[in-house]
Every structure is written in structure tokens, then in C-alpha cells.
From Swiss-Prot:
The gene is rps4. One of the primary rRNA binding proteins, it binds directly to 16S rRNA where it nucleates assembly of the body of the 30S subunit. With S5 and S12 plays an important role in translational accuracy. SUPFAM superfamilies: Alpha-L RNA-binding motif. Residues 89-152 form the S4 RNA-binding domain. SMART domains: Ribosomal_S4, S4. Pfam families: Ribosomal_S4 (PF00163), S4 (PF01479). NCBIfam families: PRK05327.1 (NF003717), rpsD_bact (TIGR01017). GO terms for cellular component: chloroplast; small ribosomal subunit. This is Small ribosomal subunit protein uS4c. It is found in: Plastid, Chloroplast. One of its GO terms (biological process) is translation. Part of the 30S ribosomal subunit. Contacts protein S5. The interaction surface between S4 and S5 is involved in control of translational fidelity.
Length: 201
């Protein structure tokens, strides 16, 4: 299944706020209206919607998300928590959380077009897993810096998660540590996502 490129507002109206996909928010009460329109949701549908929420927020294909679930399942600790850490530490999501891109698809485009350096080397793989002490900067070219500055200026000035630091005048972000569960950028029940995949196998 390919990455979603359709109308974004349609998705947030059905699944709720997806800040990685779009800064728009569904009107209050729209989720309740949808629930009454479609009737009582089955347990399968609840798990499916939670999985879709995760997939659309982080901009993943079905195959990519399944691969992350399998990696998380083999790691120590809670599969759901490890899954969220893996997704949050992706380079495209890290740029988004730093405010250097307005959405995760926008961050992915910056990476694909080779505007981003990690530890002074160009990284053009959005799924690159950021590690503690990674230094994320832009190329010295004026176009790269202008793109990043525009995003920083227009992004809502919310408090950064503790695992990140932004030096906006230097166009530089620092990864301080692995993200903790309290700083995840999406309201999600990750256990339902794990349950969804465990019942598919």
C-alpha cells in the first residue's frame, strides 16, 4: 500500500488531529458525529483506526509500519513504546518536532532534496534513525537556509520536547537523548496498534 497523498482534512475529520500530516484541526464534536453516523464501532474497527492514525501521522506506507512493528516486537521493553520511539526518532519526524518543517511530508521533502545534514554529512534518507548527540543542520546554500527559516518563523512556538534543542539562528538542532513516552507528538493508544498487527498474523 502506497503513502497517502489524498485530501488531508478528510483524514483528520475521521481520525482526529494528525499534526504530522496537517496543522488543521477537526471541528470539535466532529468525531462524535462520525461515530453516531456509522453506529457503534467494532473492536476491530477501533484497532484499525488507531493503526491508521499512526500511519497517516508519520506518513508511512503499510509495509513500512509493519516493519517497524516487527522491529519493536524483537526489542526489549513494551512493543508499543518501542514502536513510538522508533517512529519519533526518524529524521523527518525530528525535523518536524524541531519546527524546521511544518509537517512530516514537508520534512521528508527537505531530506529528499538534500537540504539536511546530520553530523556535517548530507543525509537524504527520511527514515534515518536519529541518535543522542546527533547534530542536524542545513546546507550552507541560501535556498536551504531560507526554506528552514520560513518554517521556523511560521511554526507555532510551542515548547520543544526535552530530547531536542533548537538553535534557530544557526539553523541547528541537537538530539539530546532518546525520546521518552511523555513527549510523543500524537495522542494514540499504541497497544491497540500492536493488537491490530498481532491479530493479522
Amino acid at each position: 500500500m502506497s503513502r497517502y497523498r489524498g485530501p488531508r482534512f478528510k483524514k483528520i475529520r475521521r481520525l482526529g488531529a494528525l499534526p504530522g500530516l496537517t496543522s488543521k484541526r477537526p471541528r470539535s464534536g466532529s468525531d462524535l458525529r462520525n461515530q453516531s453516523r456509522f453506529g457503534k464501532r467494532s473492536q476491530y474497527r477501533i484497532r484499525l483506526e488507531e493503526k491508521q492514525k499512526l500511519r497517516f501521522h508519520y506518513g508511512l506506507t503499510e509495509r513500512q509500519l509493519l516493519r517497524y512493528v516487527r522491529i519493536a516486537g524483537k526489542a526489549k521493553g513494551s512493543t508499543g513504546q518501542v514502536l513510538l520511539q522508533l517512529l519519533e526518532m526518524r529524521l523527518d519526524n525530528t525535523l518536524f518536532r524541531l519546527g524546521m518543517a511544518s509537517t512530516i511530508p514537508g520534512a521528508r521533502q527537505l531530506v529528499n532534496h538534500r537540504h539536511i545534514l546530520v553530523n556535517s554529512r548530507i543525509v537524504d534518507i527520511p527514515s534515518y534513525r536519529c541518535k543522542p548527540r546527533d547534530i542536524i543542520t542545513t546546507r550552507d546554500e541560501q535556498r536551504s537556509r531560507t526554506l528552514i527559516q520560513n518554517h521556523i518563523d511560521s511554526s507555532p512556538h510551542e515548547e520543544l520536547p526535552k530530547h531536542l534543542t533548537l538553535h534557530s539562528f544557526q539553523y541547528k538542532g541537537l538530539v539530546n537523548q532518546i525520546i521518552d513516552s511523555k513527549s510523543i507528538g500524537l495522542k494514540i493508544n499504541e497497544l491497540l496498534v500492536v493488537e491490530y498487527y498481532s491479530r493479522q498474523t
